[in-house]
């Protein structure tokens, strides 16, 4: 599967980072919006740097042009100040879906030779 058109832009709200506020003795959930601002259908997948502390629901999906999805980013309880949080982030990866593909996410879209774009959203923890 070759793709000559690189994936277009997405927007995220918030645009640059995610902030969680103390206390961290309970689970926090923060919502972010991902908007496909391109003219083509995309498949997206979300990765986190810390699987045991951070979760995203839904972790992947398909967005038509101009369509948006609300994602729940959750942070499980942890001992703030006793764990390294410096590199925590979530990464949105997206790629154009093949022409004629059903609107159902497929992991192999990211494993071929098609172009995949990424947007990192660092996570900030306020004490």
Curated annotation (Swiss-Prot):
<dbReference type="GO" id="GO:0005737">
    <property type="term" value="C:cytoplasm"/>
</dbReference>
<dbReference type="GO" id="GO:0005856">
    <property type="term" value="C:cytoskeleton"/>
</dbReference>
<keyword id="KW-0007">Acetylation</keyword>
<keyword id="KW-0206">Cytoskeleton</keyword>
<dbReference type="InterPro" id="IPR008962">
    <property type="entry name" value="PapD-like_sf"/>
</dbReference>
<dbReference type="GO" id="GO:0031143">
    <property type="term" value="C:pseudopodium"/>
</dbReference>
<protein>
    <recommendedName>
        <fullName>Major sperm protein 152</fullName>
    </recommendedName>
</protein>
<keyword id="KW-0966">Cell projection</keyword>
<dbReference type="InterPro" id="IPR000535">
    <property type="entry name" value="MSP_dom"/>
</dbReference>
<feature type="domain" description="MSP">
    <location>
        <begin position="9"/>
        <end position="126"/>
    </location>
</feature>
<dbReference type="InterPro" id="IPR051155">
    <property type="entry name" value="Nematode_MSP"/>
</dbReference>
<keyword id="KW-0963">Cytoplasm</keyword>
<dbReference type="Pfam" id="PF00635">
    <property type="entry name" value="Motile_Sperm"/>
</dbReference>
<feature type="modified residue" description="N-acetylthreonine">
    <location>
        <position position="2"/>
    </location>
</feature>
<comment type="function">
    <text>Central component in molecular interactions underlying sperm crawling. Forms an extensive filament system that extends from sperm villipoda, along the leading edge of the pseudopod.</text>
</comment>
<dbReference type="InterPro" id="IPR013783">
    <property type="entry name" value="Ig-like_fold"/>
</dbReference>
């Amino acid at each position: 599967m070759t793709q000559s058109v690189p994936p277009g832009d997405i927007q995220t709200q918030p645009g640059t980072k995610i902030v969680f506020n103390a206390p961290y003795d309970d689970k926090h959930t923060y919502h972010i919006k991902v908007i496909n601002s391109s003219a083509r259908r995309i498949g997206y997948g979300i990765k986190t740097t810390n699987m045991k502390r951070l979760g995203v629901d839904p972790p992947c999906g398909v967005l038509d042009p101009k369509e948006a999805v609300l994602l729940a980013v959750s942070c499980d309880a942890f001992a703030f100040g006793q764990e390294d949080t410096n590199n925590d982030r979530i990464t949105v990866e997206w790629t154009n879906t093949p022409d004629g593909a059903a609107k159902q996410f497929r992991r192999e879209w990211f494993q071929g030779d098609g172009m995949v774009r990424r947007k990192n959203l660092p996570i900030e923890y306020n004490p």
